[in-house]
């Protein structure tokens, strides 16, 4: 987690707590907390890295160019050589990205629940995150003389996607009503992934490799095929603490979700764990606490 993201989370957490402490909720029996509640979520998504291999440039689907074939197109070669110089006239791809992975990302969203009493609630969340993935590939070309070692240059290839999670769950409080409590929550989860781009940069030139393919007999044209939004159903569970105030509840929890994401035909669609620590500030609009 970067220092910038840590600072953002701490500032928001402080603002939430200060706002919620204006009025404390009188603690009573289980019926004191009842009715509809709405709120905001902010978390830090740590996704499973396996689906990210869609963006690493390695051979995937027939008919689409992998990184090696893309760099081998004569007009792409001309552009790369113009950037790197004539010394790179005989360049080749030396190494595909290794250990390709997502970067962790900030996730934000909304929350709604119906609280039956202090102990039981039905909850729903919708969270959004923009994920970026990155890896390094290596280009090799001969040295300036036949006696020198080959020259290796490294470049970054990246992918970017929007991910949405929609969950419907059941929350149960573990223990008697209190200003400080522990809760367990679980339920089904719908995940949707919208791929935005897959590209790399050499010098000032950016190349899009997202489902790149040649155009018929055209010798110098490439197009990028579209990829539809990928959706799947999984599940989640979370364990956390909650602070109770007059009309506010502040949840602090760790959510573990099992999501079945496959971004290309050859990728196995299996449940993979994703982790998300988060804060959730909820305000009670109706019921006994108002």
What residues fall within each predicted segment?
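Cleavable N-terminal export/targeting peptides
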Residues: 1-34, 287-290
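Outer-envelope beta-barrel architecture signal
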Residues: 5, 30-38, 118-122, 178-184, ...
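Outer-membrane beta-barrel proteins
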Residues: 21-27, 46, 116-118, 168-177, ...
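Hydrophobic, lipid-facing positions within transmembrane beta-strands of outer-membrane proteins
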Residues: 36-38, 106-110, 162-168, 233-239, ...
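Extracellular/periplasm-exposed beta-strand and loop segments of Gram-negative cell-envelope proteins
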Residues: 51-59, 64-103, 130-165, 191-232, ...
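Membrane-embedded beta-strands that build the outer-membrane beta-barrel scaffold
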Residues: 110-112, 122-126, 170, 239, ...
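Predominantly the C-terminal beta-signal and adjacent terminal strand-loop region
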Residues: 235-290
């Amino acid at each position: 987690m970067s220092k910038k993201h840590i600072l953002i989370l701490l500032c928001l957490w402080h603002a939430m707590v200060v706002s919620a402490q204006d009025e404390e909720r009188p603690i009573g029996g289980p019926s004191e907390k009842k009715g509809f509640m709405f709120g905001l979520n902010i978390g830090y998504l740590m996704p499973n890295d396996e689906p990210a291999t869609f963006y690493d440039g390695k051979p995937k689907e027939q008919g689409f160019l992998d990184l090696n074939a893309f760099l081998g197109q004569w007009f792409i070669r001309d552009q790369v050589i113009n950037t790197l110089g004539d010394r790179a006239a005989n360049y080749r791809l030396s190494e595909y990205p290794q250990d390709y992975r997502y970067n962790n990302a900030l996730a934000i969203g909304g929350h709604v629940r119906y609280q039956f009493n202090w102990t039981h609630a039905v909850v729903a969340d919708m969270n959004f995150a923009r994920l970026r993935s990155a890896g390094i590939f290596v280009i090799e070309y001969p040295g300036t003389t036949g006696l020198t070692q080959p020259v290796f240059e490294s470049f970054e290839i990246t992918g970017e996607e929007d991910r949405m999670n929609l969950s419907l769950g059941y929350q149960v409080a573990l223990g008697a009503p209190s200003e400080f409590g522990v809760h367990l929550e679980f339920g089904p989860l719908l995940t949707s992934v919208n791929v935005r781009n897959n590209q790399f940069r050499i010098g000032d030139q950016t190349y899009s490799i997202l489902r790149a393919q040649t155009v018929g007999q055209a010798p110098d044209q490439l197009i990028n095929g579209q990829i539809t939004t990928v959706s799947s159903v999984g599940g989640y569970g979370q364990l956390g603490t909650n602070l109770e105030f007059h009309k506010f509840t502040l949840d602090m929890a760790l959510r573990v979700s099992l999501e079945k994401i496959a971004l290309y035909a050859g990728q196995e669609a299996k449940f993979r764990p994703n982790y998300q620590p988060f804060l959730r500030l909820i305000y009670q609009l109706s019921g006994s606490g108002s």
